[in-house]
UniProtKB/Swiss-Prot annotation:
Basic and acidic residues bias spans: 72-82
UniProt source species: Gallus gallus
Disulfide bridge partners, by residue number: 105-116
Tree of life domain: Eukaryota
Name this protein carries in UniProt: Somatostatin
GO biological process: regulation of cell migration
Subcellular location: Secreted
Record bears the keyword Signal: yes
UniProt-annotated stretches for the region Disordered: 60-82
């Protein structure tokens, strides 16, 4: 009977200690500061991750814009060249009529047959 009372007393004492330590844990100022810092750091990491994600998403659009600009410049240069060729051909002597080719005519030129 004595051992049963002793076991109950020890069980109640251990439960009381467990409840006391659990209720006392959040009131520890160092632990509270640590938790607040870790939450702030987690929020900062999320913001940092969002920032890097936005940077990564904007990089392809920037490179696409640069590629489009370079294509526009090359197209403009090609158009200028075509315009200059047209002006030269208009100002020069009348062009000779292109050689008329017969159907099925083949010439031997540099080891191969070419059509006329």
């Amino acid at each position: 009977m004595l051992s049963c009372r002793l076991q109950c007393a020890l069980a109640l004492l251990s439960i009381a200690l467990a409840v006391g330590t659990v209720s006392a844990a959040p009131s520890d100022p160092r632990l509270r500061q640590f938790l607040q810092k870790s939450l702030a750091a987690a929020a900062g990491k999320q913001e940092l991750a969002k920032y890097f994600l936005a940077e990564l998403l904007s990089e392809p659009s920037q490179t696409e814009n640069e590629a489009l600009e370079s294509e526009d410049l090359s197209r403009g240069a090609e158009q200028d060249e075509v315009r200059l060729e047209l002006e030269r051909s208009a100002n020069s002597n009348p062009a000779l009529a292109p050689r008329e080719r017969k159907a099925g005519c083949k010439n031997f030129f540099w080891k191969t047959f070419t059509s006329c």
